[in-house]
Amino acid sequence: PEAVTAWARAQGVNAMRVDRDTNRLLRDFYRLGEGPLTEAFETAAKADPSLLGKGSRPDAAFDADPRDTASPAAMATLLTRMFAGKALSPESTKVFTAIMERCRTGTARLPGQMPPGTTVAHKTGTIGGTVNDVGMVSLPGGNGVVIAAYVKASASPVADRERAIAEIARTVRDYFLFAN
């Protein structure tokens, strides 16, 4: 994790930090013990069935934790550099973009209200009251616009949070399409 934060800093992105791997982040969120993650979760959920719905409910302590955070501006700056080939080698930029274009989660988020044929290269994040999506939306003519949309500490249904992201993304896309 420290190496990722250092790399982001080298890209000029300071409002981003990576402190834990995904395994540790999930263990901290669900307050799980050691051992294989799936087994630890299943054991904890048997003892406390409310854990099964925790993944879509806000957790004030978790939301206030400064670890593993990035401001939307920091994320957008990093993604702009990455998609433009300024942060990775040309080959790695192609691989990165292809991976982001294959994202199958969050179809109701950044891509949710895009016109048919619009390429959206994105990555979602969901935990507790946080629902987000970051990536690049293609524009006709070969350009694109990077969007980092976060909904944090929300008790609204996930579908409502996703719709907010989709509406923002479509508005941003249309603005850049028609303003240029």
Report residues per predicted region.
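Active-site-adjacent helix/loop patches that line small-molecule binding or acyl-intermediate pockets
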Residues: P1-S56, A70-A74
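Structured C-terminal helix/loop/strand segments within mature extracytoplasmic catalytic/sensor domains
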Residues: A60, A64-N180
